[in-house]
Amino acid sequence: MDELNACTECGFTTTVFSEFQGHIEKHENEHSRSSSGEMSNSQTIEWGDGIQSSTPSPRSTPPSDPTPSPDSDEHLEHHISITEITNTLIKKEPGTKGQKTVHVCPHCNFTTCMSQHMKSHLEAHERHQGQMYQCDICKMQFSQKANMHRHRMRHSGVKPYECRFCKKRFFRKDQMQEHSMTHIKTGFGFDCPVSQCNMQFSQHNALRAHLEETHTISSTNPASCKRCNLMFANSRRLLLHFQTRHDDSESSPKKENTPKRKKLSNGNALPMDPANMSITEQLQRMVKSEFSPPNTDTSDNSTSSEFDKIPPSFPMANPDILLMCLNQMNQFNGFGENIPRPMLNIPNIPLPALHNIPAVAAIVKQDQVQLWSEQTSSSVSVSAPSPSEQSHSPPANESSLSLTEKEKSPTPEKEDEENVECCHCGMMFYDNTMYLLHKSLHSDGDPFKCALCGTQCGEKYMFTTHVIFADHSTQATTSA
């Protein structure tokens, strides 16, 4: 069998040596006509019968002593090393202006258009002999496992990186960044990416000229990004990093500072005073002030009065979770419907059909009866005078005048009855009914144990949070 002759410059292979010699002479004539003269003389690799020229073994090295053809010239007879392959092993189609040169690795199927990448790849073959990571599909080898996995995604067809301008997808992140630069260059108003440089340019070419002339960025004099202080030894890489990583927020159109939408309220809405807020709003404010971290950002407007008027972001399962105690209408005999709706600060809607435990209703009903009996006895004592008072009673007009004055002037006892404080939570209630509803949520033995579901909270803030956000409808359904 004739020996196979392969051209290292363009990959041409033939077993007829006369054809191969004419092919080599054609390359030499082209090199003599070219003015560059940088291309070295072509070299020939002759492979044995048991070695394939197109796809050699992935982990094998080139033959240390290839056998040349007996009629070959002198420039085809010397040894081929790794450095010589780096400079001469290319596949080139001359004659077309601007066409890229494709470099082919002799050990695996790695190809690239950049000579520096090929040089690094061949050096990796030399350093990691027998330890390269190989793709199981195309047998291409890599010195790093991450690069092999990145290459493996090409075979899967998944393109994880998307251009934010045209939504085109890419296999590799650097390819997506290079593509994004084609969109970024068409814009205007470019900032210099070098830290402590506030220069701005209207055109992208002017910015690149500024980086090359003003900032001499090199390996000995690296420059840092003005946003993240990452160091770069190449101006092009710095510009690519800055305009694809950080400049997306700057290049986007700035939004106008429009006033925030305020919470809608009717004309009869009460001011934000603790006396006029519902229990839910008081609990929400107390929990928010305790659990929210301190605001150290001066630019944040979350503490402004306008922000407080925005409705809370967390959802509420019911209009007022404390109305869970008012669901059993038969035991209360219409007690829940008699509570004024403005006092509860909720719309005029029917109460939620929740099924609470009967003990809560009994406690509220008993306390309400006691409160009603105390008010009745006090009113009877005021309206029914004693016999001594009847004997020394003033005239009818004077007694009526004194009664009206007593009604107009509030007594200290009445003020104390209106302002009731929970001894466990420290919350102030300006209505006895709301205090009784809140009191029924505490268990008798443990004040911080929820009387609705039996959850042990431990302290007042956890108890308050549990009362506001816990979903007691499931326990109510099971108890029913």
UniProtKB/Swiss-Prot annotation:
Q: Where does it live in the cell? A: Nucleus
Disruption-associated phenotype: RNAi-mediated knockdown does not cause defects in somatic gonad development. RNAi-mediated knockdown in a ehn-3 rd2 mutant background enhances the defects in gonadal development in the ehn-3 single mutant.
Locate the compositionally biased regions of type Pro residues.
59-69
**Where expressed (tissue)?**
Expressed in the somatic gonad, hypodermis and cells in the head and tail. Expressed in amphid and phasmid sheath glia, amphid and phasmid socket glia, and in neurons in the head.
Annotated S-S bridges: none
Transcription found in the keyword field: yes
Q: Compositional bias of type Basic and acidic residues: which residue ranges?
A: 244-259, 404-413
Start and end residues of each stretch annotated as Disordered: 25-75, 243-275, 290-311, 376-417
Keywords (alphabetical) are: Metal-binding, Nucleus, Repeat, Transcription, Transcription regulation, Zinc, Zinc-finger
Q: Which GO terms describe its biological process?
A: gonad development; positive regulation of gene expression; regulation of transcription by RNA polymerase II
GO cellular component terms given for this protein: nucleus
What is the recorded function of this protein according to its Swiss-Prot or TrEMBL entry?
Positively regulates the expression of ver-1 in the amphid sheath glia of amphid sensory neurons. Together with ehn-3, plays a role in somatic gonad development and is required for proper gonadal primordium assembly and somatic gonad precursor cell morphology.
This protein is called Zinc finger protein ztf-16
Please give the organism.
Caenorhabditis elegans
